[in-house]
Swiss-Prot record:
One of the record's GO cellular component terms: plasma membrane
Family of the protein in this entry: Belongs to the complex I 30 kDa subunit family.
Name of the featured protein: NADH-quinone oxidoreductase subunit C
Enzyme class: translocase
Membrane topology: Peripheral membrane protein
Oligomer status and interactors: NDH-1 is composed of 14 different subunits. Subunits NuoB, C, D, E, F, and G constitute the peripheral sector of the complex.
Keyword Cell division among record annotations: no
Enzyme Commission number(s): 7.1.1.-
Chief place where the protein resides: membrane
UniProt source species: Polaromonas naphthalenivorans (strain CJ2)
Gene from which the chain derives: nuoC
């Protein structure tokens, strides 16, 4: 495939994105050869539309979207908002990529706008983030669970979700069917004690 424009450098692309988004970009950072753009929830849809349509950006494809839970980030030293939605965007025509991040403004009820109307590939990705993290995507036309079982309680990728879950499944001989019941396994520490010690291996 021949591109109409040669790929620009990462720093040049970062400057272009910062110029296009203006005040809608809370930060534009470059690390490990990748650009990460963070926007406020109120500017999420407008910023996403600009990244898709603006000359020099043209990110026509959303490759991936996932949720993140920062509640235990940096060993509990992180004091920002808990839930984040991170997307990876690709410009096929300009051969360039960017990561777009937005934090949910309310930790107790995480909500951001759906970008399904901008990139329809976001449909199942947003359902997955809703299922696993409990992030609500306002404007999504079919926000149902997609991976967990019917009647599943909670959101299993949240840092405070118990490793044993809330219910277990077993075959009941009397009823001659599979049933669900509260878990009978007691939670226990699965990390070897030596690794849990402070400053193990010089780690801070």
């Amino acid at each position: 495939m021949e591109f109409s424009h040669p790929p620009v450098s990462v720093s040049q692309l970062g400057e272009t994105i910062a110029l296009v988004l203006g005040g809608k970009a809370k930060s534009v950072k470059i690390a490990l050869g990748e650009i990460t753009v963070t926007v406020a929830a109120a500017d999420y849809l407008a910023a996403a539309t600009l990244l898709r349509d603006a000359p020099g950006c043209k990110f026509e494809q959303l490759l991936d979207l996932c949720g993140l839970d920062y509640s235990e980030y940096k060993n509990g030293q992180y004091d920002g908002l808990r839930y984040c939605v991170s997307s990876h965007l690709l410009s096929v025509s300009l051969n360039q990529r960017v990561r777009l991040k937005v934090f949910c403004p309310d930790d107790d009820f995480p909500v951001v706008d759906s970008v399904n109307g901008i990139w329809n590939s976001a449909n199942w990705f947003e359902r997955e983030a809703f299922d696993l993290y409990g992030i609500v995507f306002e404007g999504h036309n079919d926000l149902r669970r997609i991976l967990t079982d019917y009647g599943f309680i909670g959101h299993p990728f949240r840092k405070d979700f118990p490793t044993t879950g809330h219910v277990e499944m077993r075959y009941d001989a009397e009823q001659k069917r599979v049933i669900y019941q509260p878990v009978t396994i007691e939670p226990r520490e699965m990390i070897p004690r030596v690794i849990r010690e402070d400053n193990y291996g010089g780690l801070q």
